[in-house]
Amino acid sequence: MGERLAGKKAVITGGASGLGVAIARMFVEQGAQVALTDINLAGAQKIADELNASRQGCASAHAHDVADEEQWIDALAKANTEMNGINILVNNAGIGTMGSIEQESYANWKKVMAVDADSVFLGCKYAMQYMKQNQPGSIINMSSIAGLYAAASMPAYNAAKAAVWLLSKSVALHCATSGYQIRSNSIHPVFIRTPILDGITDALGVKTTEERDKVLTRGIPMRRIGEPEDVAYAAVYLASDESKFITGIELKIDGGMSAQ
């Protein structure tokens, strides 16, 4: 086990699947204690049990709809009690929809904005009180390459992830100018091999994951889909004291796509 995050106490939303699981596993491997929150409590508890089997008492699970303000207040209070402090927040939970501006419904627009953008505002706002008591701290907000580059087929997702990008900078400036030792940064992955890609397979009209990957990697110079660990390594760096002079940045994990 490493020690890059020894003594750190992290809240990770969307901790039952995908990137949340990869980040939680790597945080624990590096010595952190984690509180996994998810609307799927059973899934989050399963991951917490797995982590506790490797190091007893390193993980807990909490039911949490990230679009609900009161649930944010409750989940953070419980996590703070469970871990005796919070100094890392990973706003990872998110959803996506496909469809042009003419196809997208207002209901879907509001849902994506609530889960992907409002949740980050709520997390940053309500975690701050705990993080100020446990400095230094790090806020890591999961945006997307789609928050920097638009596509005709995902207006709601583009808008929500772009909001996360600039909100992260606003929070970084607030903390820095307030004298808080709390950093705020955003991560911007391209296509990562998680369950969210399943919906893209159908939208592309292809039948196999191999066909899907071939289509999706056409614009990626490294010609591959990202792995969850690619994002988790970045999260460990931003959570650790190794990045103590880094705040307000967008870290792109895109296989060179944005370099073109």
Regions found by a protein language model. Name each.
Residues 2-4, 149, 236, 247-260:
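Short C-terminal tail/terminal secondary-structure segment
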Residues 3-35:
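Canonical Rossmann dinucleotide-binding motif of NAD(H)/NADP(H)-dependent dehydrogenases/reductases
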Residues 100-101, 105-110, 139, 212, ...:
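Substrate-binding pocket helix/loop in short-chain dehydrogenase/reductase
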Residues 124, 160, 168:
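Active-site helix of classical SDR
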Residues 129, 173-177, 244:
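Alpha-helical segment proximal to the catalytic Tyr-Lys
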Residues 144:
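Residue(s) in the substrate-gating loop at a strand-loop-helix junction
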Residues 176, 181-183, 246-248:
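Short, small/polar-rich loop/turn modules that mediate ligand/substrate recognition or access, typified
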